[in-house]
Design a protein with these regions (language model features):
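Active-site-proximal helix/loop microenvironment
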Residues: 49
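Secondary-structure boundary elements
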Residues: 1-46, 57, 140-145, 152-170
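Hydrophobic alpha-helical segments
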Residues: 14-17, 52, 66
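A broadly tuned "polar low-complexity/structure-edge" signature
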Residues: 69, 87, 150, 162-164
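Hydrophobic/aromatic-rich core segments of domains that either
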Residues: 54-139
Length: 171
């Protein structure tokens, strides 16, 4: 119902994606006592979540209208991780969207932008957990996992050594 209502108010696919971004900005709170994977149902009921949970809501809304979307995970030099989304439109390519910056840009001004100094570099595209979209069958995202080791220099720059890559599409 939510996806259809947003779609009906949108001019085209990119307008729909921006309206989904604004929906998450207005309807969900960023922050969770315990970070980590939570079900989509949990996030929808509680109207809050961490970066991955809020990205999952955005991604699911896009996929409900057959717009390709995926999770991206970045590793920061301080050791923390951050998750945001990408979605694909033929005339534009992959467009980044970080719904957690919505509090600073509630007018949608951050839509389609990413600050890599805050997000770090990408170590994973996709999350391999099945996503249950209310009454529809389970869907899952692609998974790319990298085994890596990080060493810090005196200048606090991270060096990454990628030793293995495992890919599995549509688990």
């Amino acid at each position: 119902k939510i996806s259809k209502a947003i779609w009906d108010e949108s001019k085209d696919a990119i307008d729909y994606a921006k309206n989904c971004y604004l929906f998450v900005a207005k309807q969900f709170e960023y922050g969770e006592k315990e970070s980590g994977f939570k079900s989509l149902d949990y996030t929808l009921i509680n109207r809050k979540g961490d970066c991955g949970n809020l990205s999952s809501v955005f991604i699911t809304l896009l996929r409900m209208q057959d717009i390709p979307a995926r999770h991206l995970m970045g590793f920061r030099p301080d050791g923390s991780l951050h998750v945001w989304a990408d979605f694909y439109l033929q005339d534009y390519g992959w467009i980044p969207v970080d719904v957690t910056y919505k509090h600073d840009y509630t007018d949608g001004g951050y839509f389609g932008k990413i600050k890599f100094k805050h997000n770090g570099f990408i170590v994973q595209r996709g999350i391999g957990h099945p996503i249950n979209v209310l009454d529809s069958p389970k869907r899952s995202t692609g998974l790319q996992t990298y085994t890596y080791q990080v060493a810090y220099t005196k200048e606090e720059r991270a060096k990454v050594y990628i030793s293995r890559k495992v890919e599995c599409i549509e688990v």
